[in-house]
Amino acid sequence: MMIIISPAKTLDFSKFNETLPMTKPYFLNEARELVEELKKYDNFSLEKLMKISPKLAKLNTQRFQNWSESLESARQCLVAFKGEVFKGIDVGSYTMEDYFYANDNLRILSGLYGVLKPFDGINLYRLEMATRLGIGGFKNLYDYWGNKLIDNIMKDIERRENKAIVNLASYEYFKAIEDIKTIGDIRVITPIFKEYRDGEYKIITIMAKRARGLMTSFIIRNKIEDLEELKEFNHDGYEFNEELSNEADLVFTRDIHNRN
């Protein structure tokens, strides 16, 4: 079984985990090509392209100018990514067994690096998958990556007995590999997290992000291989809601005022 998640916009390179190995990302050549294109953008044009503030544009212009494919100043991506999903994952409390299970079973989609394993070393960057970066005749990153990401994941998953994918990525990122759903022996399960608000269950983005991280960690810590066991997830007051679920979507709900 494979878990798919999105990266985070925020990176923290202040800490380095010397006990973990560091590996090279598979799509390093593509990352280099994208960075070379992004180096052509000045602060103002990067601000417009990424729809970010002038301050963030300046920061990321500098990042791209200084970017290196070398692992010398890199960090393992699972340790470096921050944000709500990664707060839920909470790698700081992982055992070595958890880390290595994650490296085998967790994949992080990335606008720059394509597909990352947790131990893959990354350098500072910001590039969301939905960015309309034109390069080499491709109008955006979805076109640029094409079937490369699906092919990479399929090679990985073909060696597994359980060929299920647990989709804990955002729509923006899973869209890059959405056609994987049409491949015969692949089953894609998407956990969805909803809060009870104003008389109905709704997806509250920031809470859903953290819940996706909690579910990711639940799978990793418990070494789950049976999809039925996902229904046992009950962190932060969430419970499996059979009535709202179907074969493809597992819905977990909670009353925000009655957290555990």
From Swiss-Prot:
GO terms for biological process: response to hydroperoxide. Signal peptide: none annotated. Pfam families: H2O2_YaaD. One of its GO terms (cellular component) is cytosol. InterPro entries: YaaA. Belongs to the UPF0246 family. This is UPF0246 protein Cbei_1739. It comes from Clostridium beijerinckii (strain ATCC 51743 / NCIMB 8052).
